[in-house]
Amino acid sequence: MKVTRLAVLNTLATLTVAWLPTTDKTITSSNGTDLFKASHGKIRGVNLGSQFVFEPWIATKAWSELGCEGQESEFDCVMKLGQDAANKAFAKHWDSWITKEDIKEIRSYGLNTIRIPVGYWMNEDLIYHDSEYFPHGGFAYLEKLCGWASDAGLYIIIDLHGAPGAQVAKNAFTGQFADTPGFYVDFQYQRALEFLEWMTIKVHTLHNFRNVGMLEVVNEPVQNPQVTTTLRSNYYPNAFHSIRKVEGALSIDRKDYLHIQMMDGAWGAGDPHEHLTDDYYAAYDNHRYLKWDPRVEVSKDSYIKTSCNDNVATNWPAIIGEWSLGVPDNVQETADWKPYSNLDFYQKWFAAQVQNYEQHQGWIFWTWKTQLDEYRWSYRDGVKAGVIPTDLNAVFREDVCKGRSS
């Protein structure tokens, strides 16, 4: 008997569905609306990229308005501007990049989840003030944002996007442009654990954080299991211990525990489950960008076929926490790939990815908005272009994957 991958995944979903917001904890808006009913419990969300960890390529105009033009990362910009000037500049950004109106718009598009990337420096007690340069004051804006999202009925994932010492080299998403990844040592792990404990206290004691159901303990570690050995043997088990220790001290009921998310084994940093002795409410994350996968033939048919058949996760339950409609730099402005003259292809590719990712626990698009003047990295612009439907169940009405089995 031939057992399909979809059949196996559906069986697993039946066995492990208890962790979902609709099952162990009803999440509703202030007027009682459950946004998960329309998605049958699947996560459908967007990342709030560049709100608290600025990636200059996403919004070069806003980066320049901060006074950061020519700087690689927040660390570099704060060092250039000076602490007081940087604090004032970033406060204006935090107050304007994602607003209450953005949250209303996200909800109106049929989405039910936001993922908020943050850096460890949001807990300002963890900053080495004599050698680290990050903007101060972000937490008040995070709390306000989570309050808006909770009122709207959105599920919230807080993601440790920027880890102490930087989890990868030369990438602004860590908050700095470090020459080498410095995260994978005990004292940096300890700083990250202190951040997770601090964040857990905030989530369970402040009303605005009531819809935060998941903490991701580090975003996109190095894709090399040899480099990340202690991440798996030390940091992941201790992250569970630290979060549960706080929840125990606060007498939190087990059904209200935070889900603890790690990068899935398919990410390439090894099996996150390898050394766990406690995996209660564990969750996993993978990021899928065909743009950077040299194994995939760069053709429209190949992209849709790959997305239809992609094995995107090895652990369960998994969320595809970042993905986009981005294509390789050397073809993205050619006739076959330009965004506004190839709407039909991008509609189908979006549908293929959603259909695949909802065989798991769902997806979170990267990102909500950009200043790129096109939609391949901007969910908001994708809706306005007609590539992304506001009725997300519509992507299942036309089977774009029919006849495209691997």
Curated annotation (Swiss-Prot):
Reaction equations catalysed: Random hydrolysis of (1->6)-linkages in (1->6)-beta-D-glucans
Localization: Secreted
Matches recorded under InterPro entries: Glyco_hydro_5, Glycoside_hydrolase_SF, Glycosyl_hydrolase_5
Molecular function terms, GO-annotated: glucan endo-1,6-beta-glucosidase activity; glucan exo-1,3-beta-glucosidase activity
EC number: 3.2.1.75
Keyword field: Carbohydrate metabolism, Cell wall biogenesis/degradation, Glycoprotein, Glycosidase, Hydrolase, Polysaccharide degradation, Secreted, Signal
Keyword Secreted attributed: yes
Signal peptide bounds: 1-18
GO cellular component, one term: extracellular region
Catalytic residues in the record: E220, E322
Glycosylation (residues): N31
Record's keyword annotation contains Transferase: no
Top-tier EC class: hydrolase
GO biological process: cell wall organization; glucan catabolic process
Function text: Beta-glucanases participate in the metabolism of beta-glucan, the main structural component of the cell wall. Acts on lutean, pustulan and 1,6-oligo-beta-D-glucosides.
Protein family membership: Belongs to the glycosyl hydrolase 5 (cellulase A) family.
Name recorded for this polypeptide: Probable glucan endo-1,6-beta-glucosidase B
Originating organism: Aspergillus oryzae (strain ATCC 42149 / RIB 40) (Yellow koji mold)
Native organism taxonomy: Eukaryota, Fungi, Dikarya, Ascomycota, Pezizomycotina
Name of encoding gene: exgB
